[in-house]
Amino acid sequence: MDTEFANANHPLHFLHRLLPAVGPGLLIAIGYVDPGKWAATVEGGARFGFDLVLPMLLFNFVAILCQYLSARIGVITRKDLAQICNDEYDKWTCMFLGVQAALSVIALDLTMILGIAHGLNLLFGMDLSTCVSLAAAEAILFPFFATLMERCKASFLCTCIAGFILLLYFFGVLISQPGIPLSINGTRTKLSEESVFALMSLLGASIMPHNFFLHSAIVLQHQGPPNISRDALCLNHFFAILCIFSGIYLVNFVLMNSAANVFHSTGLVLLTFPDAMSLMEQVFRSPVAPFGFSLILFFANQITAFSWNLGGQVVLHNFLRLDIPNWLQRATFRIIAVVPALYCVWTSGVEGIYQLLILTQVMVALLLPSSVIPLFHIASSRQVMGVYKISPFLEFVALISFMGMLGIKIIFVVEMVFGDSDWVGTLRWSTVSGSSTSYIVLLITACSSFCLMLWLAATPLKSATRLDAQVCNWDVQNAVSEPSTLIEEEFLTENICTGEELIERQEQLPEPGKSFESYSNITVANADPDLPETIMESDQELHLTTIKEKHSEVAFSSPQTFYEETSPTTESASLSASVNLVPDAELLVAKKAKIESMDPVEKTLDIEGELHTEKEDDEGDNWEPEDSSKGVPGSTLSLTSDGPGSFRSLSGKSDAGGNGAGSLSRLAGLGRAARRQLAAVLDEFWGQLYDFHGQITQEAKTKKLDALGVDLKLASSQLKVDTAGKESSGYFSLVGGRASDSLINSSLCDSPKQLRVQSNIDSSYGVQRGPSSLWSNHMQLLDAYVQGPSQSIADSSERRYSGVRTPPSSDGWDNQPATVHGYQIASIANRIAKDRGFSSLNGQMESPAPISPSLGPRNYRDPLTVSMGKNLQNGLSSSQASGFQNLAVTRNSPLQSERPYHDVYSGSADDTGMSANTKKYHSLPDISGLAGPYRDLYMSEKNAQWDKSAGFGSSVGRSAYEQSYYSNTGSGAGGPLSFNGLSKGHGDAFSLHMTPDPGSLWSKQPFEQFGVADKIRAVGSGLGNRSNSINREVTSPVDSEAQLLRSFRHCIVKLLKLEGSDWLFRQNDGADEDLIDCVAARERYLYEAETREMNHVDHMGGSTYLYSDRKSGSALRNDDASITNIMVSSVPHCGEGCVWRSDLIISFGVWCIHRILDLSLMESRPELWGKYTYVLNRLQGIIELAFSKPRTPMSPCFCLQIPASHQHRSSPPASNGMLPPASKPGRGKCTTAATLLDLIKDVEIAISCRKGRSGTAAGDVAFPKGKENLASVLKRYKRRLSNKLIGSK
């Protein structure tokens, strides 16, 4: 029966044995859930790849060794390490050890504060100064929660919470690991002077000095069952520590591997705290990652505080002789930690915070050599540990570990003083300028710690010194022929009197008779000191607990019995001075009588027993952590930035990147290449309107593009009527007309009158695409913004940095023929063969394969046929072949001026003079509804040349559908098509009719008889054909506004395609920014819907134009640029309250200014400063329009509706079923001049702190010049905004 009962309780018994070992390990390991350690790990991986993986593993083994030795000391001696050091070292040595432990605790507290501040910043959007203050203020909650629970309950609860957090932390990383391959194929470790700084930071992140003292103290609070031997208990502690620290290393390895793959492989450098945090947030690929991090850090901070409450007071009492309440102790440490945090936030910004985290770990590493000496000395001391001293092998491992730490420290100090590494230069220039004390602090810390280490290494333990003196006296006493009893009594009396102070310092162990028992350990002269360590502790402890009541039994035992019943502790060494000279067991009678008659000994034991009980009561203080995840409503967010913006993660509102993080890895989620592209896209857009002085360009005035100041009150039928199928290549040669757009914008091109209005405008370059006047109108609108060849930044930067953030692209699709009409095939055949890899075309091209029936439904689903039919068919007779047009380009056309950039098209027409030797197409099938979409689909793919012009008209010579129809001619299966010359009879228009025979290849298909294709064709047929004359008519304000809005849509789509663009549209600023966020959310939805539709068609095998190098990926990747064309063909309009009017461009200007200033807060690359300066220079023209007079915020209209099923993916999220939410309460006003002035001040402070390395081109030229240029434009902004601010008052 007893056996069955024991078996039933076996799991409970196992847990009862395991918890005393696992509990202390969990409470210690929770301190490694620390942003400082993440930053050090990510920094090592980002700078040196996988070179530091092996050193980090070795550091983890050393940490396991140190924590095991600390726990072993507590288990064996039943005293914590601080108490033993107090016994073994003098007062001043203990004081310095206490200062080192306090510095380590303060460093941990500092990193925890910064981590919690970062979490608050992500969750609530507050600036970092406020977040740091709030994170520090939570210390006042500790006394309140500490009084709510009893000591044992608080300890158990905190242990459980610590285990739960660590499990979430470990398994969360492993389960949610991003798609970054783990590189475990043994890379060689390459160490150099450049990596010493990173090695020191990893060492400090792996081992914390105060944990040595804390672990041994917590072990005393988690005593194991009395029937377990101490060897078994030590083994339990070892396995618990091994498992926990293995999990910590696994997490660090995943972080380092991710950093090496994301940052080191792409050459990016981390410079800010959000950079490191962004990678950690990427590892947890969940939308609730910021909230989870904040919660984990909050609980980790409270449990760390509880752990220090369990053992920290003993440390301070034994080292610093301080007896202060726990709450005051915690508040003092918190205040000391907050001072450098706030100083760094105010002076150095986000980049300074990141450097502070790394420097904190380095400073902790500098303290390690002097901190491990007491640990290793005591663990290997026979006088303290007795037979439980560590084995010679462990002593050797400890010595090697110490030498390794000391060697790294020496190399670090020597390099810091005499070296010229990059990290040394970074520390030195701040010292020369007097703006930072980090170099001096590290140097002082290293020197003082080195001196203390030498002192500790040269100072033996007091117990060892006393034992040596006793051995000397033993030899002298053996030469004296006196009665042994008299010698013993005199010696014992003298030593007890003179050693009273020593006895009073001993702590009473749980067993009252332990001090007496310790005498017997040394009394036995013939005892073997190398007795095997297999004595069962259960028997020893049984005798020890009854020793006070059975003195006679113990006193008259044999010497061997005394030794077996002894627990070798510190008392055995400290009291041995009074009993070591007794050679005979007979003297034990006198010794026992004298000890029992001594009041000081008994008094000391009794008092210490009471103190032990009181200490247990005092150390029970704990407080239950409060959930810090309570949301703050968006209405409490301020529009202004409080404090230096450079110290905030992009105004404290970055989402992953971070906030995350240029030169930085991902500055607020935008990589370096993405930021370059962002600046290029914005410069490209605003370059159509403003020059670099913020003035309207002459060309914009000529073409009436300065429509932002015009109050247009035109009917909706005249506002957004342009449904051109082609935007200029500067914005990805657009094709419009999506089914979703068609359904929403019912007023688009729904009457012949609207078409006639637009049909009166010809192309400004005199290029007529076929007989369609509407086409001419649109090309005139698109060409109006041509700026010249200088706008090649966007796509060239994409190609150049494609390996960093964007998929690689080629220009194989860039220079394909726009159409076969109006061009000589021979002049472009070689170019096509080069790009497409054809061996030869020989003047002939294969026609596409017969159209798949699956293309029909695709055409039918787009009822408006905005770009698929209308752009091709307007102005054509219903009997004309609308799939192709004739382009008659005259020799005097202004298009010739664009030949350097469009020579493939204009050159062919100009050089050949449209020779009559070439043959012209005379008839073509009416497949406009089929060929158009798929010609458009791939038109912009790899559009490196045409996507970089500033305006809309740089690719005048090619139409939206002409480009891609023959882009994959090599894959066609049809018969050859001959193109010989431009027929005079058909130079301006198609005159051939289609064969009406339904069985003919050219007959109208059934699905072409529906929709609006015929309607548009009929309307177009009445417009007639137009000549190639150059029409320089000035466009109306309506047309100008339509052009700008289409360009704006195109710009938004390009921004959405940037890697990490989510941050751009989730900043929750003013009403203008919220409106742009809603527009971006709508455009994203449309884009993704079209992507899914295209993917569905491809999956069904309906596309004959699939190109071989198409890659799968994100819906907003650059390799899906072709789908962009289908989205931006028109401008929505839902009525009088529609947001799609010129005011939207003003809001976009405010948004651009805000985003550029936000990026400038954290940017540290002079190259990008220059790009931001270009954009800000142009955006000066918006200031007058946006801030000269109060503006009424526009609310999102029905054009911005998003289905409820998609709202969780949109940004910002919608609050109702259809419409995005209006501006949030409290933030419903437009961004004011005061808001931007505060932000500009923050940028100026941030930029002033950025410096390059002296003696380099970057430090001596790029940084000063970049700062000068950016500061200049910021001053102009301040002057203009200040004037507007005064005027508004």
Swiss-Prot record:
Molecular functions per Gene Ontology: cadmium ion transmembrane transporter activity; manganese ion transmembrane transporter activity
Residues carrying sugar: 185, 227, 521, 745, 1025
Segments of skewed composition (Polar residues): 635-652, 807-816
Residue numbers bearing the Phosphothreonine modification: 819
Keyword Hydrolase belongs to the record: no
Extent of motif Nuclear localization signal: 1274-1281
Biological process annotations from GO: ethylene-activated signaling pathway; iron ion transmembrane transport; manganese ion transport
Residue positions where Phosphoserine is found in the record: 646, 663, 923
Transmembrane residue ranges: 18-38, 48-68, 96-116, 128-148, 155-175, 199-219, 235-255, 260-280, 288-308, 335-355, 356-376, 393-413, 439-459
UniProt-annotated stretches for the region Disordered: 611-659, 792-816, 1208-1227
Record note on domains: The N-terminal (1-562) region seems to be regulated by upstream components of the ET signal transduction pathway, and may in turn regulate the C-terminal region. The C-terminal (454-1289) region regulates downstream events of ET and jasmonate signaling pathways, and can confer constitutive responses to ET. The nuclear localization signal (1274-1281) is required for interaction with ETR1.
Family note: Belongs to the NRAMP (TC 2.A.55) family.
Name recorded for this polypeptide: Ethylene-insensitive protein 2.1
Protein species of origin: Populus trichocarpa (Western balsam poplar)
UniProt lineage: Eukaryota, Viridiplantae, Streptophyta, Embryophyta, Tracheophyta
Gene (name only): EIN2.1
